[in-house]
Amino acid sequence: MSTANKLKVNVESDNFTETSHRSPVRALPSTWYNSPEMYELEKRAIFSKKWLLTTHQNRFPKAGDWMKFNTTGYEFVIARDRKGNLNAFHNVCRHRAFPVVQGGQQGNSSIFACKYHGWSYGLSGNLAKAPNYDQLENFDKSKNGLFKIHLKVDAYGFVWVNLDSSENPEPWTRYFEGIDQQERLEKVNWDDYTLNNEYSMEGEYNWKILADNFNECYHCPTTHPDLPTLADLGKTKCDTGEGWIKHSSIQTEEQKKSGMQLASTYFYPSASVVVLPHFMMIQRFMPLGPTSSSMHYQIFRNKNSSEEDFHNIADLYARVVSEDKDLCIGAQKNLNAGIFVSGELHPRLEHGPLSFQESHRQAIHEHAKLEREAGRQIWPARQKLPSDEAAEANKEDEALCSSLSCGGIQEVLAW
């Protein structure tokens, strides 16, 4: 028998009661992992209105530094302006919707100029120039800046965005209050961590399979032979809140001396941060479609760490996430086959994925209820038109198109 098969996994949690883990719990159905309709609903209910962790503020040391992101087809930019503030906006020109920021995923610019008709914008997203529009009446430059995105920098320096176009999205504190004040992280100097490299791995798997897999170590003894060098898999801990999952483990004295003290936090819906003395990883699961996703990794190195100390952990994690990719591809293949509906999860050893699934279930049902009451799809990230005559006419045109897609005037078009 292999060493891996001899290992036993034990997960403790402050969330359990004496009666809460006596029976297995049924997981989400497989249709939630491959349905195109569910994927579209998730774009509206989750990725258009939830706070999303993107990166760390130390990626923007100078004015003009910018990074480009894409979440379920929503491409947006985060940039530092000349006042030192970070701003986020959709990468959509207000004139004819052409992408304004091009040329890679990051860079430094003094201004953002659209290559279609020459409209240009400042680092805060305000419209700077619209050629020949100064000849027109009733054109307000102040109302034609890039579509702003809500942005928050937490106490640790992590940068969050919320794509909800309303003035008042759900508060960040609703799900994450205090998550940037963790006692186990109070001695971490976040300024010591600088980007070493980043990479992505695309695959044929739903993003939630990645989340389920990351948030339990029940599979670790079977599939990750390197992990016992990082922690004692027999003494792991998983604590959960409504929007977060905290993972920790016990290290031997030798592991502590090697800088293996691990603290991992998953942030619903699709990001996590793993930090150790020599290494930090920001992991983002980015949906590309109902059954395809990208695993994106930003790898930071402690500037005070040696090459050996950093690579001992960085190389281990690179192997682990590659192994996880293979697991998720295999599981997704069988979910798509239409035989498997759902399995029974261990309420203690798989407490993390169960917590994730419950958060997701609640968010989906909450938004679906709003849509049923409204009698239409609700896209929180969508542009809100002003209340003027031209905009009202535009709304009528849009309503016609909406009725076509919803089958509202099928009888008129039938022949």
Residue ranges and their predicted role:
Residues 10-18, 123, 180-186, 256-257:
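Short, flexible segments with low predicted structural confidence
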Residues 3, 85, 91, 152-415:
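C-terminal catalytic domain of Rieske-type non-heme iron oxygenases
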Residues 32-71:
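Non-catalytic accessory segments flanking enzyme active sites
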Residues 47-51, 98, 219:
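Generic structural signal for secondary-structure transition and capping sites
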